[in-house]
Amino acid sequence: MQETEGYLTAADGGIRLSACLLFAYACLTMGRIDHARNALGEIRRTLASGGETDPAARAMEAFVAFAAAVLLHLPLPEEMPPAESFLPLLPPGLRAFALYVQAHYLYLKEDYANSAGMVEGALAMGASAYPIPAIYLHLVAVMDYMSLKATEKAQTHLLTAWEIARPDDLIEAFGEHHGLLGAMLEAAIKPNWPEDFKRIIDITYRFSSGWRRVHNPITGHDVADDLTTTEFAVCMLAARGWTTREIAGHLNISANTAKRHISEAMKKLKVKNRKDLKQYMLR
């Protein structure tokens, strides 16, 4: 966070906006929510001002504003241009990450098949050459395939992301996406890398707390903040229509254990049936 703070007032617009985005997300994990809101506000104001005329610079403004909104599951700014107008103008590595953001946007629209297709196409066309964008692309593919109940494809993408991440310990993305991954971390990472899983979950608790403090007030969507990560992951599946037996099989736990997680979550959230869980879950 301190490394980016000095660039928040940089004269170069691309550097300043990149710093704002990185700084905002670092602040979410650190619990500095007012600082995160200020950085996100600067991003929105820059796009709204429309002062930049250079196409490449304007594309950078649009990308950063797009990423800031989509990754916090917020409405897009009114001034947001179509993605196809700015994606081609971004440098290749950044374009790969922007395709992750676009795929994430399609996921939020429940267009899971097209989102997954975008990921597969991006990876096939060279995005795998950029490790960090590749990790994020594989993770959004997990989100898509779990939404489509294609668990084998989801696991393949998760483990590919894990293979890319492990040499340099790039585990932050896994913690950031935990609740969206359909309990795949519990199913595939926890049994084989338990200590790494614990570190990922520590990131999840810190990041998601800050994320909700920005997301919930703006959207009025009260994403649950009093569940354990396992309860949340199980409830995400239950809210999407997975049966207790399917959840138990996915996590390799007993049906009674799966039912206990759901019952405890319902008690905490004061709801009486599984359908009511959905209002407290991520989209």
What feature does the model see in each segment?
Residues 1-4, 29-44, 69-83, 107-121, ...:
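Helix-turn-helix repeat elements of alpha-solenoid scaffolds
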Residues 5-16, 42-56, 81-95, 121-132, ...:
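Solenoid-like repeat scaffolds
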Residues 17-22, 27, 40:
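Extended, charge- and Ser/Thr-rich helical segments
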Residues 19-21, 57-64, 98, 137:
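The tetratricopeptide repeat
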Residues 67, 77, 91-121, 126-134, ...:
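Linker/hinge segments immediately adjacent to helix-turn-helix/homeobox DNA-binding domains
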Residues 212-263, 267-283:
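Helix-turn-helix DNA-binding segment
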